[in-house]
Each structure stands twice: as structure tokens, then as C-alpha cells.
């Protein structure tokens, strides 16, 4: 007769958490940061087609680190949720907080009930009329959710990236300031330290005044290589905001 080994629930949860953390730590980092002109989403990502940053709804964007197939399925589910809710009720009823709550429930259910947890970490951002009304939510593999102020750093070298951004970010910083700061932080988080350029970056912006500047309600705008270089060239990446 085969002897069955007992594993405590605490040990099971610890093993799941360790497994997910190791998977996330292998991924390149992402920074989401608020600026005067909007919210910048900056990722180290050399792939031109496998995006880590995406649009969810009018003023809401998504960023992720970890396993691509897992966070891409969550992104698509978020788009469907937002479309259905906006169509069924009102477009103003689609909020980052509501989307983050749905993601938290899904991640928590997978973490506790499925064979393996998702190896992902998510950020949901919603741009407001001013910086005080910006909403940034960070979601971890177990469904935990945090309402962050100013910026979010995620991924493999999160401690060093977070330290650089925290030291340089200030409310009222320009878009060029925060993009340069985020890019510098991503490079500083690498071993050895590297200087990232447009070929290794994926950057998008949630424009605060998209209806005025571009005549559209959709705030999300993905930057091309020329736009990235224009943002980085005046300051040089990694300069702290003044």
C-alpha cells in the first residue's frame, strides 16, 4: 500500500508563491509612472509584436510581466469585460478599480484552486483630468491588489528599479522627465547596467488631454522609435525629475 504524505496548506501556498515569484523574476521589468501630461508605461521589450503594454478602454491601460500567454489571456479578458460593461451600462462605468477587482478575483481563484498559479504581475492604469485623479493598481500572482501613488515598478529587478524611480519621481514632472527616469531605472536594474534605446523599449502613453490634442476620447497612444528618441534625447535616460 502506497503511503500518502501530508503537506500542510501553509506549505502548499508557500510553494505556489515561490514558484510564481521565480517565474516573474525571470522577466524584464516594467515601470508605469504618472506625469503632468499623462501616464507613461515603459517596458524593456525588444520584441516589436509581443506587447507587454496594451489598451483596455478609453482611458485605461494594462501592463504586465511574466509569462506572455498568461498575461495576454488576462488582457483579452479585460478588454471583453470593459466592452460589455461599457455597452450594457455607460462608458463612464468602466473604471480601473472595477477592472482591477475582476483581475484580482481571477488571479486569486487560479492561485488557490488550479494546479499551478499564474506567473504574472499586472498593472492597471487610468488617467484622470489631473495627476491627483490618476489611478494605478498593482496586482500580484495571488490576487493581492494595491492602490499605488505616482508609479509602479514590476519584474525581475524590481527592488533596484523601484529605488531609482522613487528617488527621482515628483508630482508635476513632465512626460519627458518620467520616461527618461523610467528608462534609466530599467537600465540600472540590469546586471551589468545597460543603456537602453528605442530598439529595446516598448513605451505607451495615456494622454491626459487626448480629446483636445488629438480629438479622440481614446487616451492610449503607443510611441514609435522616433517619438521615443525625441523624448529621451533632451535629457538622456535616467536623469531624475527636478
Curated annotation (Swiss-Prot):
Keyword RNA-binding: no
Keywords: Cytoplasm, Proteasome
Subcellular localization: Cytoplasm
Activity regulation as described: The formation of the proteasomal ATPase ARC-20S proteasome complex, likely via the docking of the C-termini of ARC into the intersubunit pockets in the alpha-rings, may trigger opening of the gate for substrate entry. Interconversion between the open-gate and close-gate conformations leads to a dynamic regulation of the 20S proteasome proteolysis activity.
GO MF annotation terms: threonine-type endopeptidase activity
Origin superkingdom: Bacteria
Role, per record: Component of the proteasome core, a large protease complex with broad specificity involved in protein degradation.
Cellular-component GO terms for this entry: cytoplasm; proteasome core complex, alpha-subunit complex
Protein name as annotated: Proteasome subunit alpha
Cytoplasm among keywords: yes
The protein's assembly and partners: The 20S proteasome core is composed of 14 alpha and 14 beta subunits that assemble into four stacked heptameric rings, resulting in a barrel-shaped structure. The two inner rings, each composed of seven catalytic beta subunits, are sandwiched by two outer rings, each composed of seven alpha subunits. The catalytic chamber with the active sites is on the inside of the barrel. Has a gated structure, the ends of the cylinder being occluded by the N-termini of the alpha-subunits. Is capped by the proteasome-associated ATPase, ARC.
GO terms of biological process kind: modification-dependent protein catabolic process; proteasomal protein catabolic process
Family named by the database record: Belongs to the peptidase T1A family.
Metabolic or biological pathway: Protein degradation; proteasomal Pup-dependent pathway
